[in-house]
Amino acid sequence: MTEHVAIVYWCDGAGHAARAIPVAKEFRSRGVEVSIGGGGPGERFVDLNGFEQPDLTTVTVEGATPRAFLEHTLFDLVPSSVRRLREVTTWLRTEKPDVLITDDVFAGLAAAGLDIDFYRIDHLTTDLFGSIWGPPLAVYNQVSLRFAEGIIVTSLWPDDPAPEGTTRVGPLAQEGEASDDIEPYDVLLNPGSHGDHFGEIRTRLETRGYDVRTVGDDDWETKPTMTPYTAAADVVVCTGFSSIADTVVAGTPCVIYPFLPFQRALAERAEAKHLTGVSMATTVDRVIDRVEAHVGSDITPDYDNGAPAFVDAVLAGIDDTA
């Protein structure tokens, strides 16, 4: 019987913590003890949801030039990686969880070294990519599956066949109760960690008379979940998968405006599948066009939160190996 679960989320961007939170809350709702940590931009959101966390070294990849990247790697990335691996190993040894959930390579290494069962969480599969990004992800998956119990992928198409060793579940959303203190509005802009041109998008939409809010702007009040904001909007423009998940589970139309290669690959697949209430834009003009099509429309996405299915998959897998 699984009584104690540890979750370690990656520390780059808030999205990794965002998808860990619904999994942690679902385990906790079933009476399972949850220990969680990761650090970085998502740490405060985990705190807001009532979880205590260890103090872990964060790891960043930086450098605008080859020399800057090399200097950062030698003097920051490598030392930080060593410290994080050591800290996560010590923490897991102390916590003694029955199973670990993680998207952190150092946590996976630590779990393998400590002989702790673990599942890797992801939102990408090799079929999304061509010859550049597909092979490295395939190798990473193969190596992961030599040590992990499996890979669980949070997906906008959870019923599609999954690669061997992989289980698909629905989008993992920071779901909560809609809030009466947030008035309905037209457009929510969520630039994430890598978005660009969102200032221009807001200006152009407001010029056309739309009521627009931007995540993190001056009048933004951070809440434990995104549901009050995504549910109050007519449409959301965002970049990363965790923001997409928060939007579609709330039943709000979503315009995916990708920047990173992984974001673009996922957005292109979503566009090709003609998902209800979900569209892609790669230019500011196209964003404006898609927003105007969605505002006031009665065509909305219909997704259940994938957290219950995620936890079911973990518990079933652990029971099978017990």
PLM features: residue spans?
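Leloir-type glycosyltransferase catalytic cores
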Residues: G150, W157-D160, H274-A322
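Conserved nucleotide-sugar donor-binding subdomain of glycosyltransferases
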Residues: F69-L109
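Conserved catalytic-core segment of nucleotide-activated headgroup transferases in glycan assembly
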Residues: R19, V23, Q174-W220
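A short, glycine/small-residue-rich beta-strand->loop->alpha-helix junction that serves as a flexible
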Residues: I7-I21
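Conserved nucleotide-sugar phosphate-binding/catalytic loop shared by glycosyltransferases and other
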Residues: E3, C11-A14, S29-P79
